[in-house]
A protein has these predicted regions:
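Hydrophobic alpha-helical transmembrane bundles of multi-pass membrane proteins
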Residues: 3-8, 13, 22-319
Length: 319
């Protein structure tokens, strides 16, 4: 009996000792478990969801696009049409109207691809010829990290810029070029002047592509030539206004004066229509300038107020 009790006591002691040993080893397991989330963290970060367009930004860019369309048709057409002689009124209206329609088509065919794809510092590629790969799900970068808009609305917004830029040139040689010559000139100028300038000034991969110094260097190297040099054209001062001004100046110089200039009356057809066109241009410019921010935030509001006040002050100074 004593041997049996001694054996049981020894067995219980060994079980107790092993239990204590297991209890002492147990805290090591949570430590290992605690390491698991840390190891999984990079995987979670890599699996972060892609940015999704905000409905408010998308709605604002849609409205801004419509406003810029109104600048060209009918704003610019009426502005120029009212300034020319009565016999050329319909001609100028049709020139602006058809030039805009033609540029929208050319932009869709190859313009967007040449201006907004990675190629070299001066031209893009034909990777998005006829909007290849541009779908309702594809996105375009803005100026803020994590903020994107649908690429389709970006395509449309930029198309309106191209159209009004070519339309602006029409006024430089109004009444002095045949309709077919105007269309040919605008098609060639759009291809060999507007598109490379747009690529050089505006093309880059967006802020989401920049994560460190190395990626910044890579984005800069792939950007357009003037963008890489630090140029910031917020709303087309270079791509639209300077570009169109140079094209119009050279065109007017090459064609020369109107026949009868300084010898016969060249009274404008209707200053009323010119006033209506100017008013539509002012209204459309809110979409042109504020929409160039590509998102609805305080910077867009600042551009909106600047457009309102600056134009009002210019009007008073002109009066």
């Amino acid at each position: 009996m004593k041997k049996l009790l001694a054996t049981l006591a020894l067995g219980l002691g060994m079980v107790f000792a092993s239990g204590v040993a297991l209890a002492e080893d147990a805290p090591a397991k949570p430590a290992a478990a605690a390491e698991a989330p840390a190891a999984a963290a990079p995987a979670d970060a890599a699996a972060a969801p892609a940015p999704v367009p905000n409905k408010g930004d998308t709605a604002w860019m849609t409205v801004a696009t419509v406003l810029v369309i109104l600048m060209t048709i009918p704003g610019l057409a009426l502005f120029y049409g009212g300034l020319v002689r009565s016999k050329n009124m319909l001609s100028v209206l049709m020139q602006v109207f058809v030039v805009a329609a033609m540029i929208y088509v050319l932009w869709t065919l190859y313009g967007y691809s040449v201006a907004f794809t990675a190629g070299n510092p001066f031209f893009g590629t034909m990777d998005k010829l006829m909007l290849k790969g541009v779908t309702p799900e594809s996105i375009a970068a803005t100026f803020s990290k994590g903020v994107v808009i649908p690429e389709l609305i970006f395509v449309a917004f930029q198309a309106t810029f191209a159209a009004i830029t070519c339309g602006l040139i029409v006024g430089s040689f109004a009444e002095r070029m045949k309709f077919s010559a105007v269309l040919l000139f605008c098609a060639l100028w759009f291809t060999f002047s507007y598109l490379p300038i747009a690529h050089m000034v505006w093309y880059w991969d967006g802020p989401d592509a920049i994560t460190d110094a190395a990626s910044l260097e890579k984005v800069t190297a792939a950007a357009g030539w003037l963008w890489a040099k630090g140029a910031l054209d917020f709303a087309g001062g270079t791509v639209v206004h300077i570009n169109a001004a140079v094209g119009g100046l050279i065109g007017a110089y090459m064609i020369g004066k109107r026949i009868g200039y300084g010898k016969e009356s060249m009274a404008p057809h209707s200053l009323t229509l010119t006033m209506v066109g100017a008013a539509l241009l002012w209204v459309g410019w809110f979409g042109f300038n504020a929409g160039s921010n590509l998102e609805a935030n305080g910077v867009a509001a600042l551009a909106f107020v600047n457009t309102l006040v600056a134009t009002a002050m210019a009007t008073l100074a002109w009066i």
